[in-house]
Structures are given as C-alpha cells and as structure tokens.
Amino acid sequence: MKVEVIFLASCVLFSLIHAHLSHEEPMKEPEYCRWTNAFNGTCSDRGNPQTMCFFDFLDAHTARVMPKNCACNDLPGNKRYCECSFVCNS
C-alpha cells in the first residue's frame, strides 16, 4: 500500500514539474554591440593586446557589461585602436 501511494505521489509530482517547465519561454539570443575607442600607447605596452583592450573597455563601462572578442590595432603617433563586442540588450 505504501509503495502505491509513493508511486502515485511521484507521478503527480513529475507531471506538475513537466507542466511548469513546458510553459517557460525560451531564452532570447543576446544582441551584441560594437565598441571602439582610441587610446594613448601601443597594443603591446602592457602585455597581451586583447587584454589591454579588455581592461580599457572595463575602465569605460560598468563591471556588469562584459566585453568579448576584443582586438587592438596600433595607430600612428603612439596610439592604439581598440574594438570589443558586448551584450547590449541585457
């Protein structure tokens, strides 16, 4: 008798969980924006060029906006050009 009650309760529980999960909306794909800026110094002044642009981005934005795919290009006159992508619809 106990086994039947436990089995029945388990079936009800699993059906409720399934019903709840089937009503959730799928997650929307994030939209990425591009950020560019020029800075003093070269891309290799303080190590890895991608890391330099990553930190340049964080200095210009709040910590919750995380950049990705950062790239650095040297410009004439001891300058560097940074470009990063970030999620802009958060």
UniProtKB/Swiss-Prot annotation:
Its main location: secreted. Transmembrane segments: none annotated. One of its GO terms (biological process) is killing of cells of another organism. Keywords: Antimicrobial, Disulfide bond, Fungicide, Plant defense, Secreted, Signal. One of its GO terms (cellular component) is extracellular region. Disulfide bonds join 33-88, 43-72, 53-82, 70-84. Residues 1-19 form the signal peptide. It is found in: Secreted. Belongs to the DEFL family. This is Putative defensin-like protein 243. It comes from Arabidopsis thaliana.
